[in-house]
Design a protein with these regions (language model features):
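Internal, well-folded beta-alpha domain core
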Residues: 1-145
Length: 145
């Protein structure tokens, strides 16, 4: 738990970027919800990106966000994402569960980089390929079960 509290940022549709250790009130504001004509993702991208780049400047970036939150922030340096494939198709509905499995793995092994994560993958995940697209390193994992 300490690892997650110290190493995880969460993108909230209402509060923007928060630390896992931040205390937030209970709220219901669904992903993609709108407040009149206010584009919340545009607001966060315009007003928080510079501070977030500064905060993360010395960190290895592992981006486990849902694709929706790409609109909130685009890293300005190398970062890694994970994509999950099952039977040749991209997993979207259960991707959140697999991102959670990776985060739990990171916490368990106190991962500092992707090599450590890939060396400790659970038996139901296998490295399929690594694609480099500009600053983004996309690690594709095959779900075996």
């Amino acid at each position: 738990q300490k690892y997650i509290l110290e190493n995880t940022l969460i993108f909230s549709n209402l509060f923007g970027v928060v630390k896992a250790s931040d205390h937030l009130p209970f709220y219901k504001f669904k992903q993609g919800a709108k407040i009149n004509n206010f584009a919340i993702e545009k607001f966060y991208k315009e007003h928080f990106s510079k501070a977030l780049n500064e905060y993360l400047k010395n960190e290895e970036l592992l981006d486990l966000r849902a694709g929706f939150y790409d609109k909130f922030y685009t890293p300005k340096r190398k970062f890694s994402t994970y994509k999950f494939i099952k039977k040749g198709k991209v997993v979207s509905h259960f991707a959140k569960a697999y991102r959670g499995i990776l985060l739990a793995l990171c916490a368990r092994i106190k991962a500092k980089n992707n090599a450590e994560i890939l060396n400790h993958l659970p038996s139901n995940l296998s490295l399929k390929e690594i694609q480099n697209k500009g600053l983004k390193e996309e690690i594709v994992l095959e779900i075996l079960d």
